[in-house]
Every structure is written in structure tokens, then in C-alpha cells.
From Swiss-Prot:
Residues 397-419 are annotated as: Disordered. This is Ribosomal RNA small subunit methyltransferase B. The active site is at 375 (nucleophile). Specifically methylates the cytosine at position 967 (m5C967) of 16S rRNA. PANTHER family: NOL1_NOP2_SUN FAMILY PROTEIN _ ANTITERMINATION NUSB DOMAIN-CONTAINING PROTEIN, NOP2 YEAST -RELATED NOL1/NOP2/FMU SUN DOMAIN-CONTAINING. Belongs to the class I-like SAM-binding methyltransferase superfamily. RsmB/NOP family. It comes from Salmonella typhimurium (strain LT2 / SGSC1412 / ATCC 700720). Residues 400-412 have a biased composition (Polar residues). The gene is rsmB. InterPro entries: MeTrfase_RsmB-F_NOP2_cat, MeTrfase_RsmB-F_NOP2_dom, NusB-like_sf, NusB_RsmB_TIM44, RCMT, rRNA_ssu_MeTfrase_B, rRNA_ssu_MeTfrase_B_ent, RsmB-like_ferredoxin. It is an enzyme of class 2 (transferase). Its main location: cytoplasm. It catalyses: cytidine(967) in 16S rRNA + S-adenosyl-L-methionine = 5-methylcytidine(967) in 16S rRNA + S-adenosyl-L-homocysteine + H(+). One of its GO terms (biological process) is rRNA base methylation.
Length: 429
């Protein structure tokens, strides 16, 4: 059966579910993708990601051009107008097509009586575009981030906060991890070149390759066979710092979707790995990743605060704790994070991280290594967290990463580099 859903109305519904209902775009988008033809999936994704990336600008424009907000059952139209603005500002969709398709979206969401309103607002924007954009360039909304997050970044990074915000507003590069059990990185780069694509090795992470141009995974040499995995360069730093060895008992805590679990097994194929995550639904992706790569690990559902429930009294040679966090280092990959997080979440997350650290530390053998990692750029979850942990944990010592005053290594997002990420390598005395 031919799929003929209006893309613009689907994008508006997706954004509404994220902003109004607090749902993650990664949960909202896949079922909507099933409603459109394959050739239209990329545009639907671009509209959803793009509107969420620039949401504060689009909201600002609506407030300038409409006397009162759309509410109640008409609220989806509010987001449909945003989709129209985004196309006119940021895509190569011809303006006449952007207008026509967006206006027609009102029919799909059963608001045909509002077609004239949508058309009028979008045409008014076209007429006033230059004036409006000049005014927007000096407004508080120009950073495309919620005010609370801008303030936190300014406080934490007085000289770098604008760089972080600019990086967050960019499209991310596509990083891959070459499976060293199949190929050397240089060998796989040769296969990539034979396939007509170009990639660049990361200077610090030995398995990481950045594609010159993002590509679908089925086009990558040996993806189905497990030769390569999509994983950001900074995320690959976790296994690099962990330095797993064959024969060791290793715990990967907060493991879903399994990218770090499989990286550990690529580095140390004969390690005994236990992968644990609290989210049973996301654990299915750990199984999928292990299956594609032909690897074996023990996978369990469990809460990191209560290790006795999922590992008894077992101790480990190495532990990777990729702690639950604000994800403020991966906003360019997941722009919905800006609108799903709240200022109050940060203290709650820091408390949860501390509880997991304290609970899992006794499960590390003396002389063992624990790598604490987050995809956050906020000090409360990173350096401050590790500083206070070291103060209250006499048998913990910092190794390789930072100093007691400035513990850990903080990667900031930017350009063609990896995402924002924090690592602290701790040794049990």
C-alpha cells in the first residue's frame, strides 16, 4: 500500500510529543518513520531534528508574528508553523513547496479551517524575514538553548561557553569504531576507500574513524558482518581508559545499548564481561549488538545502586560506570535533550551518580580499575562528583586522568571532534 502521510504534520506531531509530553525523540520518531515512504524518511528526520535544534528561534518568531498562542486541540498547528519556518530558513525545499505542504498538513491533523492562518503567518514571515532575523540576532533566544543551561555553561566555562553552544547547534560528524578482531584500522580504511568513501583516523582513540560524509550503515564495508560499529569517538575513550585484559572479570554498568560492552570485548575477546542496565527495553539492543558482532557476555537487568541483587558478592578486576547523566555533551546528536532536561534535574542526577559510585566501589578488587564516565559537560556531574568521591573514599586513587584538584579528563564537543564526555580513572588501593 502506498504511504501518503503528510511529512510536515508528522514532524509537528513528533516535536509536540517531545516538548509537551516530555518524550524522547528516539522513541517518538521510529513509529512515525513507518508511516512514510523510504525516500521521505531522511526529510522527516531532518525536520524533527532541525526544529528541535532551533526551537527557541522558531518559538520567538511565532511570538512575534501571532497575537496569541495556539492552545488545546489546536496546539499541533503551533508546531506545524514551526516546521514551516524551519524549511524556509534552513532547508533547500523550494519556498512554494514548503508553504503548500505545510498548509496542507492542517488537513492531516484535522484542522483544515486553519489553512488560511498557517498560510498567512508563513507569508508574513517571508515578507519580514530580514527585519525579524536582525532583531533575533540580539535576543536572548539567539543561543538556541534554554536560559538555565546557558547560565550553567557560562558559570562552568567562562571563556568556552560560546564554543560549546555553537558546537551543540551543529550537525554531528559520523564516527565509527573498527573491530580490531577483524581488521586493522588502516586496513578497513582501505576497504572504505575501495567503496568510494573517505574516512579519517582519530589521533587518540586507536579504533576510531570519522567519515568525511555521513553514510547509511548498509553502505559501510562489513557492517552486517561486524567489522565496524557506529560509535562516537569520545564514547570509545571509555574502553581506552579501562584497558581491559583477557581473562579478567569486567563489569559494564549502565551498559545499554551495548556499544561499550562490545568495544571491551573487541579489545579483550577472552574477558568475562557482565553488562547491566536498569532499562529492560534498552537491554534488547545490547543483545542485538552482541549478536551482530558474534560476541558473548552475561547480560542482566538491574539497578546500579543495589549490586547484590544482580551479582551477589562477586568482585571485578575492572568496572566501567557510564553513569546516568544530563547528556549535555551530546546535544548536537540529540537536540531534544535541551527541552527535556530541567535545571533541577542536575542535582538529582548528581545524587544518583554518587549513590551508584558508593554502591559499586566495594565490588572492585584491590588493585582494580574503575572508569567513571558521563556524556555531560557539567562539573556537578563530573569533576565535582569525583572530587567529593575521593574525599570520602580513602582507598580510591586517581590514575592518569587529571589531578586531585581537577580530577578527570573533560572532552568538550566541537567541530569534527567527538562529543562532550568526561572520564575519571580510579584505582583501588
Amino acid at each position: 500500500m502506498k504511504k501518503q502521510n503528510n511529512l510536515r504534520s508528522l514532524a509537528a506531531q513528533a516535536v509536540e510529543q517531545v516538548v509537551e509530553q516530555g518524550q524522547s525523540l528516539s522513541n517518538v520518531l521510529p513509529p512515525l518513520q513507518q508511516k512514510v515512504a523510504d525516500k521521505d524518511k531522511a526529510l522527516l528526520q531532518e525536520l524533527c531534528f532541525g526544529v528541535l535544534r532551533t526551537l527557541s528561534q522558531l518559538e520567538w518568531l511565532i511570538n512575534k508574528l501571532m497575537s496569541r498562542p495556539m492552545t488545546g486541540k489546536q496546539r499541533t498547528v503551533h508546531y506545524l508553523i514551526m516546521v514551516g519556518f524551519y524549511q524556509l530558513l534552513y532547508t533547500r525545499v523550494p519556498p512554494h513547496a514548503a508553504l503548500a505542504e505545510t498548509v496542507e498538513g492542517a488537513v492531516s491533523i484535522k484542522r483544515p479551517q486553519l489553512k488560511g492562518l498557517i498560510n498567512g503567518v508563513l507569508r508574513q514571515f517571508q515578507r519580514q524575514q530580514e527585519t525579524l532575523l536582525n532583531e533575533f540576532a540580539t535576543s536572548d533566544a539567539r543561543f538556541l538553548h534554554p536560559g538555565w543551561l546557558v547560565k550553567r555553561l557560562q558559570n562552568a566555562y567562562p571563556t568556552q561557553w560560546q564554543h560549546i553552544i555553537e558546537a551543540n547547534n551543529q550537525r554531528p560528524p559520523m564516527w565509527l569504531r573498527v573491530n580490531r578482531t577483524h581488521h586493522t584500522r588502516d586496513g578497513w580504511l582501505g576497504l572504505l576507500e575501495d567503496a568510494g568513501m573517505k574516512g579519517y583516523p582519530h589521533p587518540d582513540y586507536p579504533d576510531a574513524v570519522r567519515l568525511e560524509t555521513p553514510a547509511p550503515v548498509h553502505a559501510l564495508p562489513g557492517f552486517a558482518e561486524g567489522w565496524v560499529t557506529v560509535q562516537d569517538a569520545s564514547a570509545q575513550g571509555c574502553a581506552v581508559f579501562l584497558a581491559p585484559q583477557n581473562g579478567e572479570h569486567i563489569l559494564d554498568l549502565c551498559a545499554a545499548p551495548g556499544g561499550k560492552t562490545t568495544h571491551i570485548l573487541e579489545v579483550a575477546p577472552e574477558a568475562d564481561v557482565l553488562a547491566v542496565d536498569i532499562d529492560e527495553q534498552r537491554l534488547s539492543r545490547v543483545y542485538d549488538n552482541l549478536k551482530r558482532l558474534g560476541m558473548k557476555a552475561t547480560v542482566k537487568q538491574g539497578d546500579g545502586r543495589y549490586p547484590s541483587q544482580w551479582c551477589g558478592e562477586q568482585q571485578f578486576d575492572r568496572i566501567l560506570l557510564d553513569a546516568p547523566c544530563s547528556a549535555t555533551g551530546v546535544i548536537r546528536r540529540h537536540p531534544d535533550i535541551k527541552w527535556l532536561r530541567r535545571d533541577r534535574d542536575i542535582a538529582e542526577l548528581a545524587q544518583l551518580q554518587a549513590e551508584i559510585l558508593d554502591a559499586v566501589w566495594p565490588r572492585l578488587k584491590p588493585g582494580g580499575t574503575l572508569v567513571y564516565a558521563t556524556c555531560s559537560v557539567l562539573p556537578e556531574e563530573n569533576r565535582d562528583q569525583i572530587k567529593t568521591f575521593l574525599q570520602r573514599t580513602p582507598d580510591a586513587a586517581l590514575s592518569e586522568t587529571g589531578t586531585p584538584d581537577q580530577p578527570g579528563q573533560q572532552n568538550l564537543p566541537g567541530g569534527e571532534e567527538g562529543d562532550g564526555f568526561f572520564y575519571a580513572k580510579l584505582i583501588k588501593k
